[in-house]
From Swiss-Prot:
This is Renin. GO terms for molecular function: aspartic-type endopeptidase activity; insulin-like growth factor receptor binding; peptidase activity; signaling receptor binding. It comes from the Eukaryota. The gene is REN. Its EC number is 3.4.23.15. Residues 86-403 form the Peptidase A1 domain. Coiled coil: none annotated. Disulfide bonds join 117-124, 283-287, 325-362. The active site is at 104, 292.
Length: 406
C-alpha cells in the first residue's frame, strides 16, 4: 500500500496506561484523560456480513434526525453513527456500571440502553443495559425522550445519576433508552452516546455533561481536546484519547491555531476555500464547517462532493467514492482554508483500502451529506481530519484550535 492507511477489520485495542478504568488517578491538578478504542463502524460491519447497502435505501446515509422531549420537538443535526469508529468508557451509578460510548461534539445529550428495554428489541440484547435498581444514587425523572433517526426511532425516558468520566464524577441527567431498532444498533460496538455540544443543542435543554463538569471547577481550563491515532496497523496502539481541561503535548507539535465559532451553541467555524492541489476548487466565497467528533469522514454538500470527486477522478459506488488502489498514492492534496491557514490532507490521509473489499478498489474517506438550514449547508470535518490535526474545543473563548498531530 506504499505507506498509506489500510482500514482495520477490527479496531485498535486500548493501551493500558494505568489501573483506573476511567482515567489516570494520579492526574489531579492538570487535566483528565479518557482513552479511546477504535472499532469497526456499523457500515463496515454491514459490508463484512455481505449486506447490500443499496437495498437499505438512501435514508441510511442521511444526517437529519428529529429529537423529541415531552411535547417539544426541535430539529437537531446529529451524526447517524453509521461510520463512527472511536469509543471510550463511562460509568453510571453507584457503584459505576460501565458503558462504551461515542463522544460526539455534534450533539449534547447523554443516552445509554436501559434494563427496561424489552428483549424483543434485539439491539438491547447485544448491549450493556443500565439497571437503576443496582445504583444507590439513582433518581427517577421519567420525562419521555425520543430520538428519531432516519433508520429508526430510539426512545426512552430521562433519569438522573452520577456519571464517572475521565476520573471525574458528576450528577447528570441522561436518557435511558427502552426502544432501539435492530439495524443499525445491533451491529454497533458502542452502547450509547455522550454529547459534547452546547446546551442550545440539548433536547429539553438538559444541561450537557461538560457544562456540569465546568461548574465543579475541577478543570484547569474550560476546554477539551481530541486525539485520534493514525497508526491503524498496530493493534496494540492507543485508539485515541480525549483530554478534559487541556491538551496533551505528547500528541501534537507546534502551537495551536485558533478559529472563532460562527456563533455560540454549535461547534462550527468559517471556511474560506477547499483546494485540490494548488487550485481553489470549492467554497471560494466562504462556507461553514462543523468539527464533528461523532463522524469518521469529511463531508460536504452533494454538489460540492460531486465536483471534488470529479477533480479526483473517483467513481461513486453505493454511498462511497472509490478509486483504483494503484492510483491512490498519485491523488493530489486536498487543503481546507481555515482562519487564514491551509490544513492539507495527502492521499495517505483520505484514501484507504477496506480489508473486506476488492484489492483493486480503495475508498475515499469523504462523503456527500446535505445538512439543511439553519445549521447547513455545511461541511463536516470528522475523524479523517482530526487524525491529522489534534483538535481543541475551547468553551471559555468559543473557539476551536488545531495543531499537527503526532
Amino acid at each position: 500500500m506504499d505507506g498509506w492507511r489500510r482500514m482495520p477489520r477490527w479496531g485498535l485495542l486500548l493501551l493500558l496506561w494505568g489501573s483506573c478504568t476511567f482515567g489516570l488517578p494520579t492526574d489531579t491538578t492538570t487535566f483528565k484523560r479518557i482513552f479511546l478504542k477504535r472499532m469497526p463502524s456499523i457500515r463496515e460491519s454491514l459490508k463484512e456480513r455481505g449486506v447490500d447497502m443499496a437495498r437499505l435505501g438512501p435514508e441510511w446515509s442521511q444526517p437529519m434526525k428529529r429529537l423529541t422531549l415531552g411535547n417539544t420537538t426541535s430539529s437537531v443535526i446529529l451524526t447517524n453513527y453509521m461510520d463512527t469508529q472511536y469509543y471510550g468508557e463511562i460509568g453510571i451509578g453507584t457503584p459505576p456500571q460501565t458503558f462504551k460510548v461515542v463522544f460526539d461534539t455534534g450533539s449534547s445529550n447523554v443516552w445509554v440502553p436501559s434494563s427496561k428495554c424489552s428483549r424483543l428489541y434485539t439491539a438491547c440484547v447485544y448491549h450493556k443495559l443500565f439497571d437503576a435498581s443496582d445504583s444507590s444514587s439513582y433518581k427517577h425523572n421519567g420525562t419521555e425522550l425520543t430520538l428519531r433517526y432516519s433508520t429508526g426511532t430510539v426512545s426512552g425516558f430521562l433519569s438522573q445519576d452520577i456519571i464517572t468520566v475521565g476520573g471525574i464524577t458528576v450528577t447528570q441527567m441522561f436518557g435511558e433508552v427502552t426502544e432501539m431498532p435492530a439495524l443499525p444498533f445491533m451491529l454497533a460496538e458502542f452502547d450509547g452516546v455522550v454529547g459534547m455540544g452546547f446546551i442550545e443543542q440539548a433536547i429539553g435543554r438538559v444541561t450537557p455533561i461538560f457544562d456540569n463538569i465546568i461548574s465543579q471547577g475541577v478543570l484547569k481550563e474550560d476546554v477539551f481536546s481530541f486525539y485520534y491515532n493514525r497508526d491503524s496497523e498496530n493493534s496494540q496502539s492507543l485508539g485515541g484519547q480525549i483530554v478534559l481541561g487541556g491538551s496533551d503535548p505528547q500528541h501534537y507539535e507546534g502551537n495551536f491555531h485558533y478559529i472563532n465559532l460562527i456563533k455560540t451553541g454549535v461547534w462550527q467555524i468559517q471556511m474560506k476555500g477547499v483546494s485540490v492541489g494548488s487550485s481553489t476548487l470549492l467554497c471560494e466565497d466562504g462556507c461553514l464547517a462543523l468539527v464533528d467528533t461523532g463522524a469518521s469522514y469529511i463531508s460536504g454538500s452533494t454538489s460540492s462532493i460531486e465536483k471534488l470527486m470529479e477533480a479526483l477522478g473517483a467513481k461513486k459506488r453505493l454511498f462511497d467514492y472509490v478509486v483504483k488502489c494503484n492510483e491512490g498514492p498519485t491523488l493530489p492534496d486536498i487543503s481546507f482554508h481555515l482562519g487564514g491557514k491551509e490544513y492539507t490532507l495527502t492521499s495517505a490521509d483520505y484514501v484507504f483500502q477496506e480489508s473486506y473489499s476488492s484489492k483493486k478498489l480503495c475508498t475515499l474517506a469523504i462523503h456527500a451529506m446535505d445538512i439543511p438550514p439553519p445549521t447547513g449547508p455545511t461541511w463536516a470535518l470528522g475523524a479523517t481530519f482530526i487524525r491529522k490535526f489534534y483538535t481543541e474545543f475551547d468553551r471559555r473563548n468559543n473557539r476551536i484550535g488545531f495543531a499537527l498531530a503526532r
